[in-house]
Amino acid sequence: MGTDQGKTFTWEELAAHNTKGDLFLAIRGRVYDVTKFLSRHPGGVDTLLLGAGRDVTPVFEMYHAFGAADAIMKKYYVGTLVSNELPVFPEPTVFHKTIKTRVEGYFTDRDIDPKNRPEIWGRYALIFGSLIASYYAQLFVPFVVERTWLQVVFAIIMGFACAQVGLNPLHDASHFSVTHNPTVWKILGATHDFFNGASYLVWMYQHMLGHHPYTNIAGADPDVSTFEPDVRRIKPNQKWFVNHINQDMFVPFLYGLLAFKVRIQDINILYFVKTNDAIRVNPISTWHTVMFWGGKAFFVWYRLIVPLQYLPLGKVLLLFTVADMVSSYWLALTFQANHVVEEVQWPLPDENGIIQKDWAAMQVETTQDYAHDSHLWTSITGSLNYQAVHHLFPNVSQHHYPDILAIIKNTCSEYKVPYLVKDTFWQAFASHLEHLRVLGLRPKEE
């Protein structure tokens, strides 16, 4: 792509070009000024603004066919990146190219749109319908309002529906895997702000720019970010403290606080520290500012202010807590069963900041699937039981995962890349508990 001539950029110099009027990014050590391409980008303006001022190699290669954008990018080449902010991966191997070609071929040969399936919209309707109906029942259906236990039941349903907002419209939108319309992605993403009170924008930094490119890499994947000391020890290279003993017996109970933690953390990330672990936050657009604060305000209004007009404070807090904890537990347990388990890998860069592993192979080796044969678990986890499939092809609708699984597993077998899968969710979660137990043990050198 382009010539070898041009200016050299350190990652700090690249980072300064991170606005709508001055937008640079790097791919495979080559820097591009895509400011004039911004309005023509098929993936929308927001996508490029998120990647502005950084090396987006793994993200770019996730969402584009190899070589497909070379002719376009050649026009915008301006120089070479000479230092790295985050870990760097080798050129794609034969395994990576083969698995990508085979899956892309599956869709083109059958003339199937990988981003569209009719059942997407039916599931969204069920999620939002059950959320609104369960909320309404808690406040306005006399038969329910007169029975606290029934209100709690509907609060549980509502909490589960809120979790499904995160696992379906939010998650699909953040990977551009539903329709080809960036406006649809923004609207679906905003449902997370309004119904869950948590930021779609922060999620994009954490998930799309952090977790997916750098899965399980300490210091780069925000999903496994920890403090020192931290309440839990999840990474092999993380320092052990005495409070980690028997962590498998108490840490999972803390997962019920996830939603509360995220809502507060959002504000800190966007407006104070301006980074999510190692993922820098770029200037915030007017749209995202309105969605962020509008979402926070709407969440407080519908979850607290409106209920207080009809129910006593104690009951409002009870129902709020029940729904929040159900949502938190479901999301946390689902996430942990995929990556924070005993058999996955925890890659680390070498002294030059290079991960000595093909990116696609790393995605498979840092991920655990489960319950492939269960349509129920596929439905209620947003297809995260096909997590390795999702990590390799995040821009493909989750409803296609079962159809391309055989291609992926066969290719992994052919190239001797171990594919980890458990028969049930409970086996997968047991692996998470065992991982906590082992890392909670006092190290021999202590």
Swiss-Prot record:
Q: Would you say which domain of life the source belongs to?
A: Eukaryota
Where are the membrane-spanning stretches? 125-145, 150-170
UniProt-listed InterPro entries: Cyt_B5-like_heme/steroid-bd, Cyt_B5-like_heme/steroid_sf, Cyt_B5_heme-BS, FA_desaturase_dom, Fatty_acid_desaturase
Q: Check the record and name the SMART domains matching this protein.
A: Cyt-b5 (SM01117)
Q: Which UniProt keywords apply?
A: Electron transport, Fatty acid biosynthesis, Fatty acid metabolism, Heme, Iron, Lipid biosynthesis, Lipid metabolism, Membrane, Metal-binding, Oxidoreductase, Transmembrane, Transmembrane helix, Transport
Short motif (Histidine box-1): ranges: 171-175
Q: What is the effect of changing D248H?
A: In strain: ATCC 32221
- Gene Ontology cellular-component annotations: membrane
Q: Where is this motif: Histidine box-3?
A: 387-391
Q: Which cofactor does it need?
A: Fe(2+)
Q: Which family does it belong to?
A: Belongs to the fatty acid desaturase type 1 family.
Q: What is known of its domains?
A: The cytochrome b5 heme-binding domain acts as the direct electron donor to the active site of the desaturase, and does not require an external cytochrome.
Q: Summarize the protein's role.
A: Fatty acid desaturase that introduces a cis double bond at the 5-position in 20-carbon polyunsaturated fatty acids incorporated in a glycerolipid that contain a Delta(8) double bond. Involved in the conversion of di-homo-Delta-linolenic acid to arachidonic acid. Essential in the production of eicosanoids.
Return the protein name: Acyl-lipid (8-3)-desaturase
Q: Name its species.
A: Mortierella alpina (Oleaginous fungus)
Phylogenetic lineage: Eukaryota, Fungi, Fungi incertae sedis, Mucoromycota, Mortierellomycotina
